[in-house]
From Swiss-Prot:
HAMAP family, alphabetized: ATP_synth_b_bprime
Listed transmembrane segments: 7-29
InterPro entries: ATP_synth_B-like_membr_sf, ATP_synth_b/b'su_bac/chlpt, ATP_synth_F0_bsu_bac, ATP_synthase_B_chain
Native source organism of the sequence: Nitrosomonas europaea (strain ATCC 19718 / CIP 103999 / KCTC 2705 / NBRC 14298)
Name of this chain's protein: ATP synthase subunit b
Gene expressing this chain: atpF
Cellular compartment(s): Cell inner membrane
Family per similarity comment: Belongs to the ATPase B chain family.
Amino acid sequence: MNINFTLISQAIAFSLFILFTARFVWPYLLRAIEERQQKIADGLAAGERGKKELELASQRSSEVLKEAKQRASEIVIQAEKRASDIIEEAKQNARIEGEKIIAGAKAEIQHETFSARESLRQQVAGLAVQGASKILRREVNAKVHADLLASIEAELK
């Protein structure tokens, strides 16, 4: 065999191989490469979107946290105000109840004082009758001297 013939036959075989590859294999390879490039581009775009969404979610969570802290602060302030109002109301109720108790106690003291005075008047009248009976050495009839005792009681009042 001649080297020229071998070289030419190899060149023809190589040309046929290139032609076959370019016509039948190359489009599938290009399509696979393009699909892979598209998947990579989609993945990168999804990564960027995810990064932006993460940033937005971080901002939203920061805002929600800030709002929650503000709301919690408002709730604490309202609770403190309500507690203060309850304490003031309890103090006012205690004052009113204390005044009622004092007024009741004063009325009871006044009633007891009046009862004690009446009892003392009756005892004084009895002692006066006994004293008069001892002085006169005879017993004084209470029915006869009822007017006298009533006038003594009136003077003691």
